[in-house]
């Protein structure tokens, strides 16, 4: 029962991930059909959250071993996180729609800077969904590196130097992500 809930949550995570990727693409090229698809996927994620939440609460009322009880508790929190990620797809879509409606376009530099941010978001979402699906704690521990690095770049103004930013961001990201796990992480 817990394994089924984990699998369904992984499917929910994938829908949220795809929705954000599609919504980000709408800031570059508006497409009414794709926009509707993003809305539909977000609605499906909401349905997953409702159904999984109900199922997990019922499951938690049963007598479970310690590991299953912890898994159910984690899943209850995780479905909310994935639902919030999916909500961001609609926020991105709404911004893209406003840009399309008002015929607002990014400058070349702004597009390059946005691409760095989008690449980082895609990397985080890919790692997050992959780590969750595989239940890989080592991979999950690497997810936080990318947003922290990106935040540091934004704070220091590096994000404003688009051509340098992309090269430096990827160099630092790859260096940080390639570090070997500590003996404690190896299990």
Language model features with spans:
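Cytosolic, long alpha-helical scaffolding segments
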Residues: 1-176, 180, 184
């Amino acid at each position: 029962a817990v394994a089924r809930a984990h699998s369904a949550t992984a499917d929910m995570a994938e829908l949220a991930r795809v929705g954000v990727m599609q919504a980000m693409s709408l800031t570059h090229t508006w497409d009414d059909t794709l926009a509707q698809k993003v809305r539909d996927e977000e609605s499906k994620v909401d349905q997953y959250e409702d159904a999984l939440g109900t199922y997990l609460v019922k499951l938690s009322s049963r007598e479970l071993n310690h590991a299953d009880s912890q898994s159910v508790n984690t899943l209850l929190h995780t479905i909310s996180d994935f639902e919030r990620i999916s909500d961001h797809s609609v926020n991105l879509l709404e911004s893209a729609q406003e840009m399309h409606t008002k015929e607002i376009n990014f400058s070349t530099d702004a597009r390059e800077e946005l691409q760095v941010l989008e690449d980082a978001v895609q990397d985080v979402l890919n790692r997050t969904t992959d780590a969750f699906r595989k239940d890989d704690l080592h991979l999950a521990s690497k997810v936080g590196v990318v947003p922290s690095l990106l935040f540091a770049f934004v704070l220091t103004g590096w994000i404003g130097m688009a051509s340098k930013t992309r090269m430096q961001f990827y160099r630092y990201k790859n260096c940080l992500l390639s570090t070997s796990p500590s003996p404690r992480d190896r299990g």
